[in-house]
Amino acid sequence: MSSKCFDSPLFLNQKEELSEFFKKTKKKYHQTSFYIDQRKKRAVLIDDNNQPIGGKWTFDTENRKKYPSKKIPPSVTFPEKDEGYDTAYEYTSKHFESHYGELIDHPLYPTCHKTARHWLDQFLKNRFYEFGPYEDAIHKDYSILNHSVLTPMLNVGLLTPNQVLDTSINYGLNNNIPINSLEGFVRQIMGWREFIRGMYEAKGTQERTL
């Protein structure tokens, strides 16, 4: 029996592309160095002199603001329920009546590509502008704030990182999105998500058995 491995669209880098940076002989890996390499390699948010747009590779130090106590975050439109959600709702109510948590009358996340794309577009139009300064913020009364909440869709393949990056960069450059918000979002996808995947491939077993 023969087998064939295909490249995964769920990540920007394939395993062999990661191997150059994540050499097993290295003792430490630095996310910022990896991220800068990725920006240069893919010519993302850099000028003709191969320098970062905005003058810095990362605006992370400017993106740690506390969410103002009286600020009202942008409203979020959740996906409409469908037959699949109704079936899951009824099944959970019947078989897990004493479960922790609370069922709500609508899905929290998209469950198909079309609704996932709408979710991405909603983030870009309503929450992207102030994503940067509040990307690390939390609030006791609100769940989403200016976050994209795209991880579930990326992890199950409803959206690909290439699609998310291409769409968000194009939107950001054409709609006056502040550079700290645009760069901060790119860093989450191209920097942290890809870096952690590389760490898993290079040192996953070691990290799990420390």
Predicted regions and their residues:
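Beta-rich, aromatic/charged-enriched effector core domains that present basic-aromatic interfaces
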Residues: 1-109
